[in-house]
Each structure stands twice: as C-alpha cells, then as structure tokens.
C-alpha cells in the first residue's frame, strides 16, 4: 500500500502531465448495467463486476445493496479518498477518517404515489470524523480544499446535463 510520500509523488506527476497537456486528463467513462433476474442488475466497468438489487419490501430478493447504497457510497468514498489525496499533497497527517453520508427520502415520489414529492433525495449531508496530529486550522484547510475539488460532491451539488439515447430491438415474431 503506498504511503503519503508515494501518493504525493504520483499526484504531482499527474498534475504536471495535465498541466502540460489537458487532453491527458480528459475522456469519457462508460459503465454498463445489465438487467438480471427480478430486480437485480449487474454492473460492468472495465475489470470490475458487482451486483445491485432491491430489498424484499420492494419486490427484490435482498441479494445486493440497492442503488441508493452505492450512490451514498460513491459520495462517501470519493470524499475519503479525496481527503487522503489532499492530505498527502498538503502534508497533513491523518490517523483515522470516517465519513457518514446521510440522505433524507420520501418513497412516495419514487413509487409514483405523489407527483409533488421528488423521487430522489430531499436532502443530503455528510459528517466527517477525523483524527490528526495537525492543527485544527490545517485539518480545516485540508477538508475545504478536498471538498472544493471533490468530483462526486460537485456532481451532486450542480445539475449535470443528462441525456437519454434509446435503441429498441424488437424480438422476431414466431
């Protein structure tokens, strides 16, 4: 496992590369999600494969975490990793770090019961628990800097354009 010095060296090299040629850091990420039995999906992204499902109370079999768990995990893990990256870059030691992601919801929107209720979260917040020998000012600077450059935090806080493209393949009649 790389230590903070190794992480800083790698990140400094990446920063230099994208500073010299922005195109090095630009691209499009593609994740494929396939429907499986019932309310289960299989996610495929490069070498990674994992399942997503729904609980029994929504008609699933509770065989995998639901999309909300992965969404909250995406934000929380992005924050934890970002704090680690910026700690290495700024030289701020972290002895322990946990991020809790809280999301308020009303399932009436998602289930189409009430059109005035949003199908997504009504509010989100995160709580950072951090232990460090650094001063409170240094830790606050670290957290503020990492939050400013957190990609998932940014995706959630601003409206990212989202479009849908559909390809319909009709089954041959027998």
List each model region and its residues.
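Alpha-helical metal-binding/catalytic segments enriched in His/Glu/Asp
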Residues: 75-79
């Amino acid at each position: 496992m790389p230590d903070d010095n190794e992480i800083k060296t790698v990140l400094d090299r990446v920063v230099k590369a994208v500073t010299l040629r922005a195109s090095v850091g630009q691209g499009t990420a593609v994740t494929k999600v396939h429907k499986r039995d019932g309310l289960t999906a299989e996610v495929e992204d490069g070498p990674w494969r994992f399942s997503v499902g729904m609980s029994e109370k929504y008609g699933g079999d509770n065989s995998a975490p639901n999309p909300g768990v992965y969404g909250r995990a995406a934000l929380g893990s992005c924050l934890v990793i970002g704090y680690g990256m910026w700690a290495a870059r700024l030289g701020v030691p972290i002895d322990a770090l946990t991020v809790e992601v809280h999301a308020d919801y009303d399932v009436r929107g998602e289930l189409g019961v009430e059109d005035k209720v949003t199908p997504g979260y009504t509010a989100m917040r995160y709580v950072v628990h951090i232990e460090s020998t650094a001063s409170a000012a240094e830790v606050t600077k670290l957290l503020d800097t990492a939050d400013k450059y957190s990609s998932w935090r940014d995706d959630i806080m601003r409206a990212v354009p989202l479009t849908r493209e559909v390809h319909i393949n009709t089954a041959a009649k027998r």
